């Protein structure tokens, strides 16, 4: 996750309720822990994003305690805005690809989250493919502009 860069539109995020912001962060936290644990680097990442989102320290502790997919599914139901749902799926795909390895657990979680928000699997796959294409394009840019 070291090279991860969040690319969300912060003006858009500012318009979300605190519960919706917390739902985003819970989804990020659970996705980061898909391997069975949250590393210190992943915890720091969640805390930094929470600070950027303006989420209280008290809620951050709640976010970091998530240990099952069902809690995430319930939390994301607070996201009742289609654009916010698609944004969350995009950012989850970016996070899942941050280590260049998309696990089955990550794929299943992204699917469950999307479906809970009313996003069909075809749209989730479309977003995931777009993220992959974009990552490839960024890597090619490093080569072209001799930044390797």
Residues covered by each model-derived region:
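Small-residue-enriched hydrophobic alpha-helices in membranes
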Residues: 1-32, 39-148
């Amino acid at each position: 996750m070291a090279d991860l860069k969040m690319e969300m539109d912060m003006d858009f995020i500012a318009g979300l309720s605190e519960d919706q912001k917390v739902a985003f962060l819970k989804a990020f936290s659970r996705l980061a822990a898909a391997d069975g644990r949250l590393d210190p680097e992943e915890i720091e990442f969640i805390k930094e994003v929470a600070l950027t989102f303006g989420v209280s320290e008290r809620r951050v502790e709640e976010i970091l305690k998530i240990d099952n997919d069902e809690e995430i599914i319930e939390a994301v139901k607070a996201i009742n805005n289609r654009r916010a749902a698609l944004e969350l799926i995009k950012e989850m795909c970016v996070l899942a690809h941050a280590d260049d390895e998309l696990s089955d657990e990550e794929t299943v979680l992204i699917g469950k989250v999307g479906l809970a928000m009313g996003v069909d699997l075809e749209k989730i796959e479309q977003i995931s493919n777009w993220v992959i294409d974009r990552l490839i394009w960024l890597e090619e840019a490093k080569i072209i502009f001799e930044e390797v």
